[in-house]
């Protein structure tokens, strides 16, 4: 049985969804090994009562995942921690941890149409930061999915589909 490794980051539990996807993939001869991360678990309560997101602890969690070096798919919701963490920030974090990661990345959101506009216009202050964001988006093929409707079928198809081999990836192997 072929084995695929997935990390999924969402502030809402996707456990049931992941179990269904895993069960369906087994029928296709694929064992899905996955880790679900809720970024809200990496927030600290301040004396004022407010929550403060701890990026360093989340990064340590990612590093501790036993199959990180064998990761096939990295999936993240776009809207995670209000004003502090978006899916694009997690992709940047992934590239910090795995600079040569060249496998599948999935960003999903109920408002997927607004994601790229948000990344380039709202998450970037000024032209230089917009260029940085565009380079980040272009570093790897990113799949954009709506979290509604056919999400489970589409993510299953992306997991099953082998990546197109380029001359660079063939030489790297």
Where are these regions (language model features)?
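Conserved acidic residues
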Residues: 72, 132-135, 139
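C-terminal output/effector regions of signal-responsive regulators
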Residues: 149-173
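Short, aromatic/basic amphipathic alpha-helical patches
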Residues: 18-27, 117-128
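A short, hydrophobic beta-strand element within the central beta-sheet of small alpha/beta folds
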Residues: 94-124
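Conserved acidic segment of CheY-like receiver
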Residues: 2-38
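Short acidic, S/G/P-rich loop/turn micro-motifs used as interaction or catalytic elements
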Residues: 11-17, 40-46, 51-52, 77-85, ...
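Conserved phosphotransfer microenvironments
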Residues: 48-95
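A generic structural motif
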Residues: 32-41, 105-108, 136-145
């Amino acid at each position: 049985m072929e084995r695929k490794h997935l990390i999924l980051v969402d502030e809402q539990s996707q456990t049931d969804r992941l179990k269904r996807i895993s069960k369906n993939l087994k029928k296709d001869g694929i064992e899905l090994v996955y880790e679900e991360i809720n970024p809200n678990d990496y927030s600290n309560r301040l004396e004022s009562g407010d929550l403060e997101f701890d990026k360093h602890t989340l990064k340590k969690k990612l590093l501790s995942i036993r199959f990180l070096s064998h990761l096939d798919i990295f999936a993240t919701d776009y809207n995670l921690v209000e004003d502090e963490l978006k899916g694009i920030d997690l992709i940047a974090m992934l590239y910090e941890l795995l600079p040569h990661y060249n496998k599948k990345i999935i960003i999903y959101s109920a408002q997927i149409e607004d994601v790229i506009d948000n990344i380039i216009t709202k998450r970037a202050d000024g032209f230089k930061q917009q260029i940085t964001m565009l380079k980040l988006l272009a570093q790897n093929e990113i799949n954009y999915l709506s979290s509604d409707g056919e999400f489970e079928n589409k993510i299953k198809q992306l997991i099953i589909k082998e990546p197109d081999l380029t001359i660079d990836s063939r030489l790297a192997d």
